[in-house]
Amino acid sequence: EAKGPVSTVYFGGGTPSLFDLSQLELLVSRCLAAGTHPSEITLEANPEDITDERLKAWLAMGITRLSIGVQTFDDDRLRWMNRAHSGQQAIDAILSAHALGFQHLSADLIYGLPDRKTPFAEDLEKACDLPVDHLSAYILTVEDQTVLGRNVQKGLESVATESLVEAEYAL
């Protein structure tokens, strides 16, 4: 039971959009039944998980904001990150969500990507041209225990230079 008013609920941590719709609806309804009446309920989603059916269901259950893991609109860098979506799919997901009634959309971007064909500034411009009201930018973090981390250690992959990361952060 909630000890005080909860103004926002955030379903994050990766890909909660992969929840079966009935599971997610149960989570949302339990939040609401606990006496909370949040002004905002956010769901993180990857572009490839966004369909009209899911968008309509999320709206019906009370999701008010989508935080979409765009990462970049650069297809080459998306492939490098082993992402399942393309830059165009990210754009289409945002436009579909807006067209179906989501008033609050967030796009997550990553800066500090090595060997970009398009500058991070172009990702920012594209995101700002879309109907999003929030942008989050995260630096690429290379963890030793990941495939990328091991490949960097072996010299098979490069990382962005410190000056590039600083310049992109300054944007």
Predicted region positions:
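C-terminal scaffold of the Radical SAM
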Residues: E1-L171
